[in-house]
Amino acid sequence: MLLVISRCPPGGTIRSHFSAWVVLALALLSSLVAGPLLAAEPLTTFRVELDRGVDRGQNFGSLFEVATSDGELVLGAGFANQYNTRLRGDRHAVQFFVRPTRARRELAAVELPRPNTLCGTYLVARDERLYSTFGGLAAWQPDQKRWAPEAPVGGTQETMRVGNGILELGDGVVRYNGATILASPAVGSYERFFYALGRLCFYHVVRNDRPYRPFESDTDGFSRLYACPWVPGDGPVDLARAETLRLPVVGETTFAWGQTGSRIVTGSNIGGFYEWSAGTWRKLRDPQLGVSFQLYSSMAFHDQLLMGQYPTGRLFSLDGQGLRDLPGWPPVPPQVSGSSREAQTTTIYAGELFVGVWPWGELWQFHPDRREWTLARRLFSHPELSNQVIHPYDKENAGNPVGNQWGQRVTSLVTVGESLFASTSAKDPCAWDPEQNPFLAPDKWQAYGRVHELKLPGHLQAATRWTTGVTRLEFELRGAQLRIVQDGRELARTTVEGAAGELLKNRDQLRPVAWKQGIYGPFGGDSLTGQVLE
């Protein structure tokens, strides 16, 4: 600011004195107005106009991805496509991330209060609310730091937003906006619902209280896959229009579904792998009685669908080459056995890939630019890692009905707001029996069923409003601040801390933007146009 002071000379006029004060007042005013403007940090906006089309349960994928010219940062936005052990991620939640390519970020962690008194839980999120699904449905209330009971849905307690309505996937029953669209069958059970690509999919299983066995006749029992055409407004599901596939083994069901492009896939609990496309089911892998091969999670990652597998504990890739093992994804710690491992959960958080692995409660982190796996943390502090046993507490638990009951699961990886929430469990989320399991006294059992809130700088997520036709999403950068706006209304904002924040404030110019591409897989809506405003 240039401050000009004019003194009225002896004998000077009142008018000249008044002029001097006017100059002074104007100078002060200009400093108040111009000061903040001069200090304001530049704004960069990624403006995306997109039409998601009719909501048929599809995944919407990537909106854009871009790197800075010096290669220090990668930025992107999109809708994650993931399914973790019978629970699907929120398709309507949009993520905005900043990922340093070389600078390290510290993963902070806090433990939330326990949602139940069981040795496990599974989490799910909808509309940026976090729910615990075991021991009664409960919603996390961050302001009050407590879990609040919710009315149960039944089954896996799964709900999903479809258009402006809510689809409830209950215990053999499906409802849309409270109205039943599929009732329980007269014989057997409908299990593991999945809605995608305008198809309500599920397993119809008739076991007749007998173990797995090869199919002989419908009277003896069966497992059958269904894909039922349905969109909001159709009313009840018409089973006569369903596309079905009778499976080779009675009792087959699933832990994981997935959707990639125009395909729906599911892996059965005894190794069968099946695909629906263009109105037809087909078998890609035969089930094998007595041979373990189970898929527990699915997630879009660039142009692949990654699926977490047991007993390797690795990710398998479904791409144009079929379903194939990815050695070292993730690796095995040298201190533990490489047997009976399970990649149960997968997610994208802050632009990186995270995987939860049984039986030692490992949380692995993969950096896409460095192509590097890191053991982010172990979600249990006991017992010590050992390659002399396969599961924790194998020796102490010997003789009990389930020998590997105290293996350590990472049951959920769920993103909400700026955070990643991870939950733990024993093999079964049972109640602790101090007489049967005294080795977990007095409070070791409480490590099972914990919910951990993890934070890595550079992640922001928000629930988007459903629109018919085009909607505008804007992803803003100002200094170290991230902001998401939909049709002029702010959805969320955060400030990126640490080294990532400093890089963001001093970022280099941007390389050309890749629209409709990125870590969340190809864009899955009807249309998208983008521009960068600076």
Give the predicted meaning of each segment.
Residues 1-18:
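N-terminal secretory signal peptides that target proteins for export/translocation
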Residues 21-33:
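Bacterial N-terminal signal peptides
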Residues 34-40:
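Boundary at the C-terminal end of the N-terminal hydrophobic targeting segment
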Residues 40-62, 82-118, 125-200, 207-255, ...:
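Trp- and S/T/G-rich repeat-edge/linker motifs of beta-rich repeat architectures
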Residues 76-78, 132-134, 168-170, 202-205, ...:
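Residue-level marker for isolated small/hydroxyl-bearing positions within beta-strands
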Residues 390, 494-527:
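Flexible glycan-contacting loops in extracellular carbohydrate-active proteins
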Residues 462-469, 522-526:
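Extracellular/lumenal carbohydrate-interaction signature centered on repeated Trp-anchored short motifs
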Residues 466-497:
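Carbohydrate-binding surfaces in secreted/extracellular proteins
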